Amino acid sequence: RGLDLVICGSFALLGILVQWVKWQQLARSISPELNWTDGLYSLLGGAALGFITPGRLGEIGRGIFLARDRASLTVLAAVDKLSSVIITIGLGLFGALALWPQYRIGLLLALIPFGIGIRWGWKRWGEGGEVVSQVSSWGAVIGWSVLSNLLFMSQFYWLVRGSDSAHLVVILAIPVVFALKAMLPVAFMDVGIREAVAV
C-alpha cells in the first residue's frame, strides 16, 4: 500500500501544479506583473477558504489574497471554478451515457436546469463579461481544466481499485461520481462526499 499512497500523492501534487499553472495564466490576463509565488499563495488561500465553505464556494475568494485587482480576480476565480465544473459534468455525462445508454434522453434533459442556472448567473454577473473578454487563451484554460479533472479522477480510481486490475465500469463510473458531487448544493469540507456518492 505504500506505493499506492505515493502514486496517489503524486496525482494530487500534479493536480495542484496544473491548477497553479491555469490560475497563473488566468490571473496574468488581469495582472501581468503577478509572480508565481503570489499566484500559488492566492491559489492555496482560496483552497483553504473552499475547504471550510459549503460547495467549496470559498475558492472564488482567491483574489482577496492579492494586493490589487481583487474584484476582477474574484470574477476570474469564479470563471475558473465554473470551467472546471462544466468539464466535470461533461465527463460525468459521457460516463453516464456509456454506462446507461437506455437513459440518454433523461440524462440530457437533466442538464437543462443546470444550463439555465449557468446562463442566469452569467447574465446577472455584469462585470464578468468585461473581465472575461481580457482572457485570450480560453483553449489552454479548458485544456488545463480537462487535465486537472483527469488527474483527480485517476487519483480517486487508484484509491478505490484496491488490488484489482482496471475495470471499464469503474473507470466510467468515477466521472459520474465526480459530476454528482459537483452538482450537490452543499458539500461542507468535502468530508465523505465522493465516497457517499460512490456508494
Regions found by a protein language model. Name each.
Residues 65-72, 195-199:
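Interfacial segments of multi-pass membrane proteins
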Residues 16, 56, 77-81, 192:
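Hydrophobic transmembrane-helix microenvironments that flank and shape a buried ionizable site
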Residues 44-61:
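Short intracellular "coupling" helices and adjacent cytoplasmic loop segments at the cytosolic face
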